[in-house]
Amino acid sequence: MSTPFTLLAISDLHYTGLARQTLQPAMTRGELARILLKKVFLRLEHLNVKPDLVVLLGDLIADGKDREATHDLLALYSELTRTGLPFLVIPGNHDRGCDRFNEIFDVSPGLHTFGDYGFIVYDDTFEESHTTLRSESALKLTETIAKENPKLNLIALQHAPIYPPIKSHYPYRPTNATEIMESFQKNGVVLSLSGHYHKGQSLRINEGVYYHTVPSLVEEPYTFSLITLEGRKVEVQEQSLKLAFPSIVDLHCHTEHAYCATTIDTATALSLAKTLGVTMQCVSEHAFQLYFEKKYAMSGKWQKDTQEVQRVWETPSRNRMVNYRHFAEKLRSPYTKIGLEVDLYDNGKLLLAPEDAEEDLWDFLIGSIHFIHDFIPGKTTQAEAEKLFLRDVEQLLHLPIKVLAHPFRFFTWSHLETPKHLYPVVAEMLADSGVAAEINFHAYQSDADFIRTCIEKNVKIAVASDAHAIQEVGEFIPHINLLKQAGVTPKMFPDVLFSFT
């Protein structure tokens, strides 16, 4: 009995990072390939899936002859190695011309063994006419490997699709595809995996051999394949990065102005969000990080230091706030609303200078509890912390905020128990104030019980990426799954989720 084996298959990234932007079809988003690859691994984290092997099935870059091709390949190599997962990379026709491809990915034709499975790498010849051919020696290689490894379940990896035939003027399949199929069938190959044909072809079986063509990661709907192998049993689950659900308004996405941001880039984030089907992508930034220098901001001391707050507010720039206002205003569009994530200071006041609190400056304010005045880590008891928390929630909800961010995250970050008995209390407070509750998975685990309680009280739900890294933009699978746990189907989204209408 073979051990189950999970395979992540990705194809046709056509990455153009440092390389010049070649004349690609408008539908091919090669410039986003590295980000989409990051998003694939983030999706796997959310699905709690750790593949046994990652395979990339060719055309990693758009032009192997470009002078920057090597650097673009190295960028993709870094994304693969940082995962700690084993991987195999197959060259495609667009990778030709880069002399260092095989060296970078340590790829070689032939057998690569992982557990009970033998992966046969084929490096087929691509002609100038775009036709491809499997050599006689490569056909014999299949037979040799099968005879020498009778207990291995064999998986064939190549760039060009083998089966089924494709109706196209472009010669996607090898000219000797029929011979290849006969070789697979005679030698007991379990599965043939290919790329090249960007639309992909779903799993099918012919003469006892499974065939699957993996779609391009950089064309809608930005798909990769999760494949489960168990002996000769094969199952394929296709995962798309593009949202298939309506009414996703993301109010909570950070910018490069945040001290806690990592790889976020606002211009790229807005383009990515639209590409992935986010209905409206807004930006919001921590007010306390804009007003104060990093060390002081992250200490939370400003909550009690009214003298320092006033000193900063009296300076013309208010540290970085004025610059952020100019930046945010240029982002405002029908697709993008601008806001701030605001905290309390001085026993219940909003940390917002009078000049920054004018009504028409911001489309929305998000209320957050990152710090609690009078809370002393390690000394304040659970019961005392709960009282302080309710005090601050009540104070926030009397201020002009539209959403309460990551409602109970303070307890998690303070190493306290999440007070689930307060769910109905906070939900009632939100209902009375007309403020939405946020679903947030940034360093936090939202609870379906709380969301369900809020919905029962007609509290709107705001889904939030709370993106600090670029790959977090547009990733709402955990939010959607949580809503399902709370009894909310996608058809109910327009009625349940927060919007500006």
Short names for language-model regions:
Residues 37-53, 130-210, 391-396:
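His/acidic metal-ligating clusters that form di-metal
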Residues 244-251, 255, 398-400, 414-501:
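Charged catalytic cores and adjacent phosphate/nucleic-acid-binding surfaces used
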Residues 244-346, 383, 414-415, 420-428, ...:
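An N-terminally biased module of ancient metal coordination in phosphate/nucleic-acid-related enzymes
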Residues 32-109, 113-114, 298-326, 330:
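Core catalytic region of metal-dependent phosphoesterases/phosphodiesterases
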Residues 3, 144, 201-246, 467-501:
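Binuclear metal-dependent phosphoesterase catalytic core
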